[in-house]
UniProtKB/Swiss-Prot annotation:
GO terms for cellular component: plasma membrane. Residues 19-764 are periplasmic. This is Cyclic di-GMP-binding protein. Residues 36-46 have a biased composition (Pro residues). Residues 23-35, 47-63 have a biased composition (Low complexity). The chain crosses the membrane at residues 765-785. Binds the cellulose synthase activator, bis-(3'-5') cyclic diguanylic acid (c-di-GMP). Its main location: membrane. Keywords: c-di-GMP, Cell inner membrane, Cell membrane, Cellulose biosynthesis, Membrane, Signal, Transmembrane, Transmembrane helix. Pfam families: BcsB. It comes from Komagataeibacter sucrofermentans (strain ATCC 700178 / DSM 15973 / CECT 7291 / JCM 9730 / LMG 18788 / BPR 2001) (Acetobacter xylinus subsp. sucrofermentans).
Amino acid sequence: MKMVSLIALLVFATGAQAAPVASKAPAPQPAGSDLPPLPAAPPQAAPPAAASAAPPATTPAADASAASAADAVVDNAENAIAGSDVATVHTYSLRELGAQSALKMQGAATLQGLQFGIPADQLVTSARLVVSGAMSPSLQPDTSAVTITLNEQFIGTLRPDPTHPTFGPLSFDINPIFFISGNRLNFSFASSSKGCTDPSNGLFWASVSEHSELQITTIPLPPHRQLSRLPQPFFDKNVKQKIVIPFVLAQTFDPEVLKATGILASWFGQQTDYRGVTFPVFSTIPQTGNAVVVGVADELPSALGRQAVSGPTLMEVANPSDPNGTILLVTGRDRDEVITASKGIGFGSSTLPTANRMDVAPIEVGARVANDAPSFIPTNRPVRLGELVPDSALQAEGYAPGALAVPFRVSPDLYTWRDRPNKLNVRFRAPPGPIVDVSRSSLNVGINDTYLEAYPLREPDSPLDQLLHGVGLGHRNNDSVQQHTMPIPTYRVFGQNQLLFYFEMAAMVEPGCKPGPSTFHMGIDPNSTIDLSNSYHITQMPNLAFMASAGFPFTTYADLSRSAVVLPEHPNGMIVSAYLDLMGFMGATTWYPVSGVDVVSSDHVNDVADRNLIVLSTLANSGDVSQLLSNSAYQISDGRLHMALRSTLSGVWNLFQDPMSAINSTAPTDVESTLTGGVAAMVEAESPLASGRTVLALLSGDGQGLNNLVQILAQRKNQAKIQGDLVLAHGDDLTSYRSSPLYTVGTVPLWLKPDWYMHNHPSRVVVVGLFGCLLVVAVLMRALTKHALRRRRELQEERQRT
């Protein structure tokens, strides 16, 4: 077996891609779940070198770096084979890889694909693709096919059978040498028929079921313990799914160590971004796999032995129970040095050495200013779309190129005078020459799955141009760049947003059935801009939707320097894990480590009274923090969460504060729960310790539901369900309420304060209008009275003279 593997590696060294090289596949093993899940990405076409049904050469394309890396890869493969007794087999459906529905191809959209990754510490030894689907019975079997490729390497061909439109399951073995760290599985459709057909019609099609399966067998590679490889091996950026990173803490609660751990969790969250990450907490080193150990050197687990350190230290060592596992030590002689060591990763990851150990020098981090999170687009100037995505992400190809997405984040507390909309300046280029019918083709623009505007690819001719074209003197320049400015309503902009551009192309109708080009390009100019500079930062709270979409108001300062986390004096592992998950969420939201947050126990809340507070607790241990919810409509007593009933007067007052509350949300009259069985609650209210500050309480009866509650925050599909000031969560079931008084966070210029005060408050407008009318009446009465008195005196004087 080793000899076969070496032969395969020699093939790789001479002409294969620079990728992990597999040995000959071992005997099939039972399916297992030890392999980290393959990533799921939105289904999108990953265009190959040529979108054609003709199969490419079966020999992988040569890579310039393959030969130089071959020796190292051979050694890795030999070591992996020598040290691995059991291979891991896992089966993934195309839905698990990102296909939300069947991959459908037709004449105008001939390419569908999926992207997925293989962890760098895994070696693929065998793979198989099992596909099923259907093809149009109108297709000609001799000239129509679906070609399957992996990283532009031929896998197989599907041919139509007019008498049996459905096919499968069909099995295709995949050469493991085709796999790389980031993979593209493509399905390319080619069709032809008798006669002349419009490529945009839906008569000729093929579809691959999302239930088709990819089976992969892997074995682990020997670990490369180099700090410069971080975040590997804990996280591989080619893996798109949620990540699990175990943490080991010597003591369950230590404010300084938990602060250092929070910095690390937020950095990992920054790296994982949209994928999501969770941090289970242990007191001992896991028996298998990787883990992060944080603590003072003298308090580290005994299984690691006595580590000699002379200051803040980062170190990677082998898992004592698993030679393939890596333990990252973040340590020092005291707690301050542990925090410094964590900053070495949070702020110095780009300078980490290739060695497995590093002494960290003190790091000074500058103070942050409000609303400067690296992930938030600035609101003081127009922002180029080229700053948000690569230029290649703004280019489209073919008749049905799919939507071009431009994601962006912004602080959700934006307010404009009289709800004036923001501006989007779009510049785009239509295909040159008579390729498509530009008069019937258009660019559709939307935001957050909401339609905004559509523009034809060629602007309508003026009457003079039409006259010149009629006599053959005019000239149309289809290659010109069009520019349009459109409004973006303020209510369409949230914390997480996505601009969508979709080119809808209409094929030219050529006489004599002349074939048109199959490949043409169009695109959005990277100099197109989105402008939020007419916005100010002010909003009404509580509003848990802002927390879900952008971590607001805590992320107003990217390092959370105006925030503190309040934990019980003796928290259990589930509460500490929920705290780390929340810090990971903050890091993924701001792209910045939470170096400014303070961690305190519930009996030291007054030390951070001037900050926004995040409380994580069980109801049984909430005695010291229940007073922090005194400004809310909810109370904690006897191990239960109660809602305080409104009086008629408070209801009237709420009407003046928020007249839409009765429409926007459900305000219950009574809520009582023990929050057990995995149920958790998230409550937001104004802090009783400082006006304008926020308290966010994450509560559970036994701590079991806290991790689920934090994970829900990072799931975009659930964000629309998170509203108001109370959310009850049980699994994916969410219920939102709004009952607490409102308060204002932020400021506006003096000239804008009247507009803010009247905004969405017709009752205030009525009251001010009445006062205005009374004032006008009083002024008029005074003026008329003075005029009458003066007229009376004049009449009296005139009578006296006569």
